[in-house]
């Protein structure tokens, strides 16, 4: 049975980490996804903007993506209602085994989080996985299922644009992406306490897959800039989704795009819910550097790997200062 895992975290020791300083404002690119379905000139400009955002920032916000506000709010409500269930109900999904199809855990046990609880489960294809999902709250499967299907659609649009922008063509890997892994990670962060020195809810890390699409109820996500390692807070723009590059897109692009290091900080005003939808190929399908992006001037930079390889990597490296993509880099002679 495939595992419900997620990211490999950069920080191994969380005690004594100083509270983060407020990052300077540095607006993130905002992409109007509707331009992808307009005329060819509009699509070309949108493709250019998406790939540029991936190259320079590793992330962007998307608007006009076709997911209704009611669908997004419904998913956040379903997540919030799940975390409000009794401890006994939530513990039905608790497991130390990352190879479970659904898993609930808290920062007191998982050795990774600093202050959060989470529920992770698979979502694509929905008919294969929804039977593992919670039946409480009563509308969970309906609301989260609708949102999962919609984010899978958006991920396909984005991947087509990115692959086109890389010169690989919009249909590159299309069938494999359609049948690929999607897993949904629901995160619940408490309100920051004035007595608590450590304000970080989730340590710096990058995600495993091609793309992560994130919905957040309130600000708390921070992203690291490629050029200077500075942090920027990601606003919770009503109706917008946050998108960032994962480790396997860095591999596929042969290093043209870099996976985004990000973290979660506790909100001083309220508790926070986020829903991360992470997209990649199927469990055993290896991702390699695209041959079209490898030549004598651009040698292959990474080894191929699959999601199963990532799961094998996790147990021995969970608490080390290392990201998964770092283990895939080919040493230059």
Swiss-Prot record:
Catalysis performed (reactions): melatonin + 2-oxoglutarate + O2 = 2-hydroxymelatonin + succinate + CO2
Domain annotation Fe2OG dioxygenase: ranges: 180-281
Chain sites annotated for binding 2-oxoglutarate: 272
Cofactor list: Fe(2+); L-ascorbate
Induction: Induced by cadmium.
pH dependence: Optimum pH is 8.0.
GO molecular function terms listed in the Swiss-Prot or TrEMBL record: dioxygenase activity; L-ascorbic acid binding; metal ion binding
Chain segment of the transit peptide: 1-43
Notes on temperature effects: Optimum temperature is 30 degrees Celsius.
Role played: Involved in melatonin degradation. Catalyzes the hydroxylation of melatonin to produce 2-hydroxymelatonin.
Gene transcribed to yield this protein: 2ODD21
EC top class named in words: oxidoreductase
Protein localization: Plastid, Chloroplast
One term under GO cellular component: chloroplast
Cofactor note: Binds 1 Fe(2+) ion per subunit.
Disulfide bond sites: none
Family, similarity comment: Belongs to the iron/ascorbate-dependent oxidoreductase family.
Amino acids binding Fe cation: 205, 207, 262
Principal place of residence: plastid
Name listed for the protein in its UniProt record: 2-oxoglutarate-dependent dioxygenase 21, chloroplastic
Tissue specificity of this protein: Expressed in roots.
EC number of this enzyme: 1.14.11.-
SUPFAM superfamilies named in the record: Clavaminate synthase-like
Assigned keywords, A-Z: Chloroplast, Dioxygenase, Iron, Metal-binding, Oxidoreductase, Plastid, Transit peptide, Vitamin C
